[in-house]
Amino acid sequence: SKKQITLLFTAADRADGADAIISTLKKQGIKGAFFFTGEFYELYPDVVQRLLKEGHYVGSHSYGHLLYSPWGNRDSLLVTREEFEKDLLKSYEVMRKAGIEFKDAPLYIPPYEYYNRQIAAWAKNMGIQVVNFTAGTASNADYTTPDMKNYRSSQAIYDKILSVEAAEGLNGHLMLIHFGTDARRTDKFYKGHLERLIKVLKNKGYKFVPLREAVGI
């Protein structure tokens, strides 16, 4: 795979990273991919419009941020097919109100980035393709708060990403950053660390490409 990276952002009900992330991507000439819940579309219509105006991909992260499978038992389901489809269609209805047509947003990141083959098959049947971030860099730990066992500081995440790059490269990586995080986390990755990381990776010869180009859809 080529020396290219795609930045993904997900959010359920927080948008505190909006200004920092939008301006960083604009400054660096990068088109990101953003996945929001129905609640997010209803709470932050102005943020959604700003992202669309900048030419970013804006898609679904479900309507109600449902947990599809129990933690630790990915093969079983907590939702019926009907519940799954109803929730997802509802999210596309909310998106349509924001001016996002179904054909503009065929790629979907499930809630909690947690799903199984059955969910992917149900989505595919609706003409929707599930995507997920590339695991291993710990970029997605940027939501953790200091009281958590799995807490990682922004510097620790930054260092981990670069150590993975040094060891095996980040070719074709879909890197997940959270669009907003808990107020208890004052050390926000999107403030400073994200831009530093982008600059370092560009210097190493990486190109940041839009999601649809990366997955070819």
Language-model segments: residues:
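Active-site beta->alpha N-cap acidic-glycine motif
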Residues: 1-76, 90-106, 197-200, 216
